[in-house]
């Protein structure tokens, strides 16, 4: 029986002084804190003797910057996979909530909010799971018998976890267990998913970090 681990790594903190829901918008880089988070995760993986043979990231800048020190630490080339990109969202580029009310309290946006189970304001949860599961399966095959790191985003990672654990895809975003620079590590025996564990190597930097998610 061949054991393989696919680590789903969420990117570090993003420089986002306006508090926008940045989604797939270009140019959203890691903050200084986010860069430190990426370095901590890379050091964590290398120092604990992980057998990482591949590192793959979403095409978005924040994911690429998070993946770079991990790839460097293991001496492997950084690859890109569009299937692990952030979720599409109609509120991209807007302040979703805040002192002024945000996009959710603007009546012009209410027609997009009629179905929280799909959801009606963005990429269907099922579509996100489908593309992520395909990327995970290809990653498992590529790194069979070893470990691979996929750098993605909070919502796609969380939905993948819920699907694997048999949970509903609709959820309260405040209850997502997928913090900045966290690892959701999926374990496989041959092609069978056998469990996961969740770790936060950069937790020491969470105090004062931005709470705004990308989607």
Language-model segments: what does each one mean?
Residues 44, 73, 138, 142, ...:
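Active-site catalytic microenvironments for nucleophilic, acid-base chemistry
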Residues 1-4, 76-80, 86-100, 146, ...:
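Acidic, low-complexity terminal tails and accessory targeting/binding regions
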Residues 48-51, 139-146:
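Glycine-rich phosphate-binding loop signature in dinucleotide/nucleotide-binding domains
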Residues 57-60, 83, 151-155:
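Short, well-ordered beta-to-alpha junction loops that form the rim of enzyme active sites
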Residues 6, 146-154:
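Generic beta-sheet signal
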Residues 15, 62-64, 86-88, 156-158:
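Short, active-site-adjacent cap segments at secondary-structure transitions
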Residues 106-127:
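Short glycine/proline- and acidic residue-enriched helix-loop micro-motifs
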Residues 3-4, 9-79:
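Active-site-proximal alpha-helix that buttresses catalytic centers in soluble enzyme cores
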